[in-house]
Amino acid sequence: MPDPARAKRLAKRISTIVASAIEYEIKDPRLAGVTITDAKVTNDLHDATLYYTVLGRSLDEEPDYEGAAAGLEKAKGVLRTKVGASLGVRFTPTLAFARDTVPDAAHRMEALLAQARAADEDLARVREGAKHAGDSDPYRVLGEGDLEGPATGGPDVEDEGGANSHDR
């Protein structure tokens, strides 16, 4: 019977074993900036997918994703052997590596948010000295001689008679 809790524990353990082996035991220079971010194990415990990110050598340099993928593919057998020796389970899961795109998407979202903030600041600067176009109440009609008197001729003026008047 599949046990999801056991699969999660096994995935966490596999993640630490593989990350440690990549950092300390595998001497492939293509794996220098590889970090294991997550691991998923199927409920039957036969397959494990490890998600990784690759860091560039400097902030300006683009990471070598193809080289890291080739290095992980080459080291897959050695890593599976180390996982099997450390876990002590009857069947050692097969390892598959997938590039984790979450950090890239997060950087893209941060850039979009920064761009939106800059646009908001530009709009706020433009808005500072602006005033409304026209009068405060464009539908208000002032009476003769009244500067601030009641409106005349508008819909709020009492009707002296006509279709809307009631009998008194």
UniProtKB/Swiss-Prot annotation:
Residues 125-168 are annotated as: Disordered. Keywords: Cytoplasm, Ribosome biogenesis. One of its GO terms (molecular function) is ribosomal small subunit binding. InterPro entries: KH_dom-like_a/b, RbfA, RbfA_dom_sf, Ribosome-bd_factorA_CS. Residues 125-138 have a biased composition (Basic and acidic residues). One of its GO terms (cellular component) is cytosol. Pfam families: RBFA (PF02033). One of its GO terms (biological process) is maturation of SSU-rRNA. One of several proteins that assist in the late maturation steps of the functional core of the 30S ribosomal subunit. Associates with free 30S ribosomal subunits (but not with 30S subunits that are part of 70S ribosomes or polysomes). Required for efficient processing of 16S rRNA. May interact with the 5'-terminal helix region of 16S rRNA. PANTHER family: RIBOSOME-BINDING FACTOR A, CHLOROPLASTIC-RELATED. Belongs to the RbfA family. Monomer. Binds 30S ribosomal subunits, but not 50S ribosomal subunits or 70S ribosomes. HAMAP family: RbfA (MF_00003). This is Ribosome-binding factor A. It comes from Mycolicibacterium gilvum (strain PYR-GCK). The gene is rbfA.
